[in-house]
Amino acid sequence: MTLATPPATNPKPSWPVFETPLLGRETVADRTMSFHFAKPVGWSYRAGQFVDITLLDPPETDAEGNLRGFSISSAPREDVITITTRLRDTAFKRVLQAVPLGTLVKMEGPFGDLRLHHAARPAVLLAGGIGITPFRSILVETIGGGALRYPVVLFHANRRPEDAAFADEFRSLGHRDPNLTFVPTMTAMPGSGYAWDGERGHIDAAMLRRHVDGLVDPIYYIAGPPGMVQALRTMLIASGVDEDDVRIEEFTGY
């Protein structure tokens, strides 16, 4: 007697999987929007982590599919789960902007291990564009819980002030905690309608030296597009920073 082979089953994931409703949308910069979702009772995450979001039965889709990974831009102490993204012209982004509030999505996670170190060394955070999102979560959570334990310098590169998400919030956090220094820099000011008297150009060693005492002393965290992340990592190591003191988080074009 031949026994039939049972159909293969997908093993149950070892991380949380749940459905949660979209509660709100908020424009936080030009072509950049935050999406707020309900946070389930008992679900938790660490500042700096990310989740996978799947659209359920969307009205349209494309070759990129219905699943994306997003850093969580909200802090664990906040009441909602927030993700923040550039509004590229994809089916996923169009659906997320258009569906009624209350629409359910599937969320999986949290994942990732981007977190500030515990040692009493200064930190330098280098963000490009939407790569700022995990740093917003980390800084709001840490400063909201008391204060930073060591100096932190946050560099955020954008094309124009119009593109810089959370800039006013970072300035406010810097006034609240003297250990935080915020250094925004703009790379395409001729295309802006704003006046600007801050840093200009891409983040480089010369810019770092203007704001960081002892280039090899801090631990560095880099988040942004892969090309920027790798260029900054190469620059830091060439400047004498130990490669073990460089932590990276790459953001692809989701």
Q: Whereabouts are the PLM-identified features?
A:
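Ferredoxin-reductase
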Residues: 3-103, 158-160, 187-188
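Conserved beta-strand elements of the Class I
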Residues: 124-126, 221
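A short, basic/flexible loop-to-alpha-helix module at the beginning of a structural domain
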Residues: 108-119
